[in-house]
């Protein structure tokens, strides 16, 4: 599927010293050619594949007000992007990690949905070899490592203003500070908590199995069915649909899974994004700390792996061959 670019603008923030971020603003929109289309397709692909947080504009959001004016035609897209870059510069300058970069604003359409994507991309140096095998320096946008990105689902925002998920953003590799400054720039607050939704789903599955009094194997088979559906949705880029999941699962007793989860008040949305790390708990146990890292299939608990809660002791019967080989070599060398 291709995306249709409506308007795209590029500006630049340059860090001159510890106190100064200089703006370089374009006087015209970027022309949409093959290179621009390829760049946006790659940025869309990279962004779509990453784990995102959800948010919504605050009532006093200047960016939201300016965007509304732009959408109504009261302000053109270039003017909107130039003013927004100024606000971004002012917010970014408050943080010591500010490095500047290429500021991108792109309005595009994908699968009948209109989006506005805003990103700060790093411009990096590299080497290239030409046809004469000469080496020269080249510059490129580091799209694969983009971590200052937000995207507004314009269709959702305008048709369902009460939504808590029309705005998405990346948390960033350097921790909370990146998302903090970007949320300040957007004047937005976090909305739908995807991890909480996924944790609620796991809790509902466990308690549904409890009510049906399933034995260990039946319970794990049921959890595996839930995981298979959710993982398929994750791999295809689709959300978990509670009604569809319920149809995939055999009813336990008189209630379907959806009826049970609604009656018990888990406050699950009708659909929500899958969280890979949380869903993995359906089929595996994992944890680390104090120099220990463990990861094993849930089916092994009570068969080859035993936990004594009284002494907080985990007993493993039958170690993996590669681990056993390391232990034997280390033991023999210490004698």
Swiss-Prot record:
One of its GO terms (cellular component) is bacterial nucleoid. Its main location: cytoplasm. InterPro entries: Nucleoid_associated_NdpA (IPR007358). It is found in: Cytoplasm, Nucleoid. Pfam families: NA37. Keywords: Cytoplasm. It comes from the Bacteria. One of its GO terms (molecular function) is single-stranded RNA binding. PANTHER family: NUCLEOID-ASSOCIATED PROTEIN YEJK, PTHR38772. Belongs to the YejK family. This is Nucleoid-associated protein PC1_1634.
């Amino acid at each position: 599927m291709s995306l249709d670019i409506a308007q795209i603008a590029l500006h630049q923030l340059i860090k001159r010293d510890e106190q100064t971020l200089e703006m370089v603003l374009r006087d015209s929109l970027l022309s949409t050619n093959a290179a621009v289309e390829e760049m946006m397709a790659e940025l869309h692909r990279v962004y779509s594949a990453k784990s995102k947080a959800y948010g919504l504009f605050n009532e006093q959001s200047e960016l939201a007000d300016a965007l509304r004016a732009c959408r109504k035609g009261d302000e053109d897209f270039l003017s909107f992007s130039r003013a927004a870059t100024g606000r971004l510069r002012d917010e970014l300058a408050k943080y010591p990690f500010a490095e500047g970069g290429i500021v991108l604003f792109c309005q595009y359409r994908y699968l009948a949905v209109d989006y506005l994507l805003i990103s700060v991309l790093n411009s990096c140096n590299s080497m290239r070899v030409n046809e004469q095998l000469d080496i020269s320096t080249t510059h490129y946008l580091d799209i694969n490592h983009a971590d200052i990105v937000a995207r507004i689902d314009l269709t959702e925002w305008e048709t369902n203003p009460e939504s808590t998920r029309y705005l998405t953003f990346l948390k960033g590799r350097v921790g909370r500070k990146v998302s903090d400054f970007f949320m300040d720039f957007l004047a937005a607050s976090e909305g739908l908590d995807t991890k909480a939704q996924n944790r609620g789903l796991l809790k509902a599955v466990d308690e549904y199995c409890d009510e049906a009094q399933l034995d260990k194997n039946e319970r794990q088979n049921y959890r595996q069915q839930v995981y298979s559906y959710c993982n398929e949705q994750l791999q295809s880029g689709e959300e978990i649909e509670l009604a569809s999941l319920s149809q995939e699962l055999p009813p336990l007793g008189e209630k379907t899974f959806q009826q049970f989860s609604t009656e018990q008040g888990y406050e699950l949305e009708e659909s929500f994004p899958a969280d890979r790390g949380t869903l993995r708990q359906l089929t595996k146990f994992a944890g680390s700390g104090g120099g220990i890292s463990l990861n094993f299939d849930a089916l092994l608990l009570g068969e080859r792996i035993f936990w004594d809660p009284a002494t907080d002791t985990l007993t493993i019967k039958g170690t993996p061959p590669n681990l056993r080989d390391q232990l034997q070599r280390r033991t023999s060398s210490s004698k």
